[in-house]
């Protein structure tokens, strides 16, 4: 059996989807072993990078597979890969015990479509739903809504993309 400290990080992407008012899409996750309470069940779309796939392509694919959204314009990305560890108590059950956490590349995009495009119950490509509901949320609230072990990543994402929320609203006429 591989020791927790020797496990690799799963290569993933995350997507901050901003609407015309500069608010961020968050989805309420379906139940999972990593959830600690009902407050920390919200997150932005994220997912794994397939072998040979570049991160930006993976981010667009994951966004579509989780939300049905394709109408986006890239605003920015975080140069660094952000890393988090999952708690040791769930590491053996999460991802079949193959990873100790995730290594994520984060992107910010402007949503150029209409809210009717968003479908988390029957998402794009016939993929299994990961969210049961969704809403637009002020960016500064995001770290308090995510499971605690992901909070440092969300704090960094919010810090890096804070100006983009204002820009998204200005460009779209929302601010």
UniProtKB/Swiss-Prot annotation:
The EC number(s) this enzyme carries: 3.6.1.-
Keyword Hydrolase among record annotations: yes
InterPro entries: NUDIX_hydrolase-like_dom_sf, NUDIX_hydrolase_dom, RppH
Pfam families registered for this protein in UniProt: NUDIX
Functional description taken from the UniProt entry: Accelerates the degradation of transcripts by removing pyrophosphate from the 5'-end of triphosphorylated RNA, leading to a more labile monophosphorylated state that can stimulate subsequent ribonuclease cleavage.
Enzyme class at the top of the EC tree: hydrolase
GO biological process: nucleoside phosphate metabolic process; ribose phosphate metabolic process
Protein name: RNA pyrophosphohydrolase
Record-annotated membrane-spanning stretches: none
Native organism: Rhodopseudomonas palustris (strain BisB18)
UniProtKB keywords: Hydrolase
Residue ranges of the motif Nudix box: 47-68
Molecular function (Gene Ontology), one example: guanosine-3',5'-bis(diphosphate) 3'-diphosphatase activity
Similarity section: Belongs to the Nudix hydrolase family. RppH subfamily.
Cofactor(s) in the UniProt record: a divalent metal cation
Highest taxon in the source lineage: Bacteria
Domain spans labelled Nudix hydrolase: 8-159
């Amino acid at each position: 059996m591989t020791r927790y400290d020797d496990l690799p990080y799963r290569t993933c992407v995350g997507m901050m989807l901003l609407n015309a008012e500069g608010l961020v899409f968050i989805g309420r996750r379906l139940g999972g072993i990593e959830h600690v309470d009902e407050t920390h069940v919200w997150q932005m779309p994220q997912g794994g990078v397939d072998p040979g796939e570049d991160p930006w392509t993976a981010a667009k694919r994951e966004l579509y597979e989780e939300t049905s959204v394709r109408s986006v314009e890239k605003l920015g990305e975080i140069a660094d890969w952000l890393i988090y560890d999952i708690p040791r108590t769930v590491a053996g059950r999460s991802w079949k015990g193959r990873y100790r956490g995730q290594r994520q590349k984060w992107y910010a995009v402007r949503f150029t479509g209409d809210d009717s495009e968003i479908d988390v119950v029957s998402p794009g490509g016939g993929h299994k739903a990961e969210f049961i509901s969704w809403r637009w949320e002020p960016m500064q609230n995001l770290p308090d809504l995510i499971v605690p072990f992901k909070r440092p990543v969300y704090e960094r994402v919010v810090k890096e993309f804070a100006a983009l929320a204002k820009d998204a609203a200005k460009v779209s006429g929302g601010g």
